[in-house]
Structures are given as structure tokens and as C-alpha cells.
Amino acid sequence: MKQIIGRILIGALAVSIPVGGSIFYFASKNDEQKKNEIVDKDTKTDDKDKDKKDDNVKHPSTGVKVSNPHKEKIELFKQSYNNDEVVGVISIPNSSINAVVFQHEDNDYYLEHNVFGGTALEGTVYLDYRSKVNSGRKNIVYGHNGDSDKLYLPFSELEAYYDKAYYDEHQYVLFEDEDGVGTYQIFSVYVETSDLSYMYMNFKSDSSWFEHVQYLKNKSMYETNVDVDETDELLILQTCSHNENFAKYKDKYLLVVAKRVNYE
């Protein structure tokens, strides 16, 4: 049976591998029965796929078809790692966060496999197996975080979002796939210690979806003044929290929640 994130984000180990201008890494494992139970009840995602672009695009002046640079980039990463499970690259402008994203049918897989698919405690960054990159109502990307002077931990900078001033300067997340780049605006930042409903994918109606989106917005630790509605498609970045205010909790996940505002 597939598992959503049975072991994730507690006690980070990491390694960095610089390839093609991006950094790829990460983490350790921890069993969490609660998250397994969520997935047992929720194993399918909404099927609201975006229209896929042609592999070739026309030059705006000549009308001649030219290769799709996004697809070429993803294919290059697949070849570099000899791994067909590369689905995109996630980044936050003017930050250290810039990582290739993988996806496997078993959500536990990349907790203990590296970018080459080899067994490794450092793992790597990955997309929830139920998500479809830059399509559907919700994408969830998992990455580990920890304290280290020697190892590069890309998602560690997410903890800077505890500071509203940092948020003001870093409101957007880019998620590139083989067809283009999705731009997402962050509207909520908070630490979850018990309620795992943010992982739900299936919603019976637009109204139930909007109720969920509004719930995520209301959980934010500060006001972002970003409006949301029932048409929004979300990207959630999840990592462990090392903030001392949440030290007493066993499970503590920092969630950075954003809505898609553009795709091109």
C-alpha cells in the first residue's frame, strides 16, 4: 500500500550535489501512523490537468518551431542522474532554495534514496505521489531541514519565513516542469503539530475546497493580505520545524502555502 509520508522530516542529515546550476540533497526518517491513515482514506487527486504544451514552440518572429527549453532542462537532469523520476525544479528567487524535484509511486522512497535512485540516508526533495506537477488543486513538495555548518540544506531557509520581513521580500515560489514555469504566491506560513488535513487531496465540491483553502489561510502566523478563492490551485512546501517555540511537540511541520498566479 502506498504511504504518504510515513517517515519524514525529523532529525535531518544532508548532502549537496551541485549539477547544472541547481542543488539537490537530503534527509532522514521517522514513522508516523497518523499520516499513513490519511492516505489510506485519500489516495486519488483531483483530475484538473492543465493543457500540455507542444514539445516544440514557435518562435514569435519567424513562426519556426524551436525546441522547448523547459523540457530540454528536465531531460538533461534525467540523463545526468540516470533517473526518469525527475518532475521539475523548485526555487524561491533571491534565496538558497533551488532543487530538482523527484516523484515516486511510494512516498517513502525518496526519504532514503538519492537523486540517482541509490539507497542513501540523505534522500532527496520530492513531490507527493498523488500530485501532478503544476496541475490539479494541490501539489505538496517535501524536503528536510536541519542545523549543519558543513552540509547544505536547501529547505533550511524556509525557517526564515517566521520573520514577516523575510516573507515580504520572498513571496513567490517557482515550480518549473517540462512544459513551463508555475509561479505561486505565498499566502500562509504556519507550523502544524497535530492536524494533518492539509494533506487531503479530494474535495467533493468547490465550496468544500474553498473552505479548505480558507482554513489554511487562517492558520497563518501572520497576515499576508493575499486573497484566496475556490479557483485557486495550491503548492505546499513542507519541512520540519526547528523553532524553539515548538520544541515540546513530537511532530512539528513548517508549511509554506502558496497559490498559483501564473503559468507560462
Regions found by a protein language model. Give the residues of each.
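Solvent-exposed, non-transmembrane regions of membrane-associated and secreted proteins
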Residues: F26-E264
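Hydrophobic alpha-helical membrane-insertion segments, chiefly the h-region
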Residues: S16-Y25
